[in-house]
Amino acid sequence: MPKVAVYNVKGEQVGEIELKDSVFGVPVNVPVMHEAVLNYLANQRQGTHSTKTRGEVRGGGRKPWRQKGTGRARQGSIRAPQWIKGGIVFGPKPRDYSYKLPKKVKRLALKSALSSKVRDNEIIVLDEFKLDQPKTKKVVELLKNFNVDSALIVVPEGEKNVELSARNIPGVKTLYANYLNTYDILKYDKFIITKDAVGIVEEVYA
């Protein structure tokens, strides 16, 4: 079992915690993590892009000039693709980019991402982090105490004040422990998690 230090919000070590091998100690599988990240990004795409074909562009119903005798190239419509303001050939149309990844693959990718954070000493476990009211300054102080600029902060579900306090800080994101994803774990330099959240992660993803 990997053992990591536990800190208070001031950055002082107050103990240690053993993390489950089945979640934080699995072999890091880079191809699987890559596939999970691609899947996450694809599922975020809106797919609302759209261009007009020659049949959808306004105008162009009349033949611009007669077929023969003008010396010019024959043309059937001023909305053909070769014309300025003409229709687009094979342009993007609205589509759904999302696709499903097998649950086992998604779970393995997430465990690999968590294990990579432990392996690379990029995990910070806090004894607790609770706020009575939204206070961005408190989160800024926390990051400063650990000399961190980029971090994913993971707390138990319901810690709304922590989420509200961190959302305006560039390079910082808050997630609830039962809503983790591989992309966000890998995106940020540090993975900051409370002891309570560790228990939830181990229970949900073990």
UniProtKB/Swiss-Prot annotation:
It comes from the Bacteria. One of its GO terms (cellular component) is ribonucleoprotein complex. Keywords: Ribonucleoprotein, Ribosomal protein, RNA-binding, rRNA-binding. Residues 45-75 are annotated as: Disordered. InterPro entries: Ribosomal_uL4, Ribosomal_uL4-like, Ribosomal_uL4_dom_sf. One of its GO terms (molecular function) is rRNA binding. Residues 60-71 have a biased composition (Basic residues). GO terms for biological process: translation. The keyword rRNA-binding applies. SUPFAM superfamilies: Ribosomal protein L4. One of the primary rRNA binding proteins, this protein initially binds near the 5'-end of the 23S rRNA. It is important during the early stages of 50S assembly. It makes multiple contacts with different domains of the 23S rRNA in the assembled 50S subunit and ribosome. Part of the 50S ribosomal subunit. Belongs to the universal ribosomal protein uL4 family. This is Large ribosomal subunit protein uL4.
